[in-house]
Amino acid sequence: MNLLQNVSLASYSGMAVGGNAAYLTEVANRMEVLEALSWAQGQQLPVIMIGSGSNIIWRDEGFPGLVMVDKIMQFEIYQEDETNTYLTVGSGENWDSVVARSVEAGLTGIEALSLIPGTAGATPVQNVGAYGQEIANVLVTVEAFDTHVRDFVTLPAGDCGFGYRMSRFKTVDRGRFFITGLMLHLTKGNPQPPFYGALETYFEAAKTMLFTPAVVRDAVISIRSAKLPDPAVIHNNGSFFANPIITDEQYNYLADNYDAVPHWSVGTGTVKISAAWLIETAGYKDIHDAETGMATWAKQPLVLVNEHAKSTADVLTFKAKIVTAVQQKFNILLEQEPELLP
């Protein structure tokens, strides 16, 4: 085991801030996971396992234990027939590469999740979703090390506690499981309309008539690239807030007082509305905050970017300003998407 000490965690966060880890090591397979966990147990140290860190914000105090960086790679067809394909995917695989390879194979089910940063193992934690698709719809099982039983377990998708941008891995069992692999169920053939709003608008403008996984992927990449900053160039965690789900009564109040509130019906008595619209309408579109060195991205206020912030405290202060502004104007509480660790 190659063990590093006193490592800056800013390099393992999309926002590029945070303190140091006492220890850090990379793990490339299950045996290395066990070796690292055994060492940490012997030292009586806490352990966190991360992917690329694209959806992580580290506290300024750092982490006084062992950080395992996931490098578990696998992309294999487990089983297939004329219609269905089951893929086994290592948790350390770059997610967009997984999407690209599945699309190249003519498989549909995750093409709308193109260009989402991070690793495959992070997708169930957040129940990653975009443009009408989400990981819960295609996930069969999650393979993980369960710290309660000190062994590897296989969890069916139905046991993952999925909700909107939510899972048991993020809530009741936060920190319990170290995800090492996924099984995905994708299908052969083409996705069928109707498509999610922005995609449908894109296809109508392009007069697209044939919808293949590759066509949808290209469209999503075009849409996302036009409005989102490149995380390799500009430090950010992607969408910083989840779209709130509110009651019909709350939505009706908004609709009566504002024009064209972006919204989606998500069930009886509830409506999902655009967090970006709330932030913009509350006065935080293209805001550059001198106090914190943070900003909202000009083309998408849902994305907070680190222009010259020096600490996680700066990020959280700017976040609090936005949350307060939205709550005061709409009485709606925005919820943070990136995970604050530890």
Task: Locate predicted features.
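Residue-level signal for inorganic ion chemistry
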Residues: 29, 53, 118, 150, ...
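Anion-binding (especially nucleotide phosphate/pyrophosphate-binding) glycine-rich loop
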Residues: 1-149, 159
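Generic structural marker for isolated residues within well-ordered, non-membrane alpha-helices
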Residues: 98-99, 275, 323
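Phosphate/pyrophosphate- and phosphate-bearing ligand-binding catalytic cores of soluble enzymes
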Residues: 4-5, 10-17, 152-314, 329-342
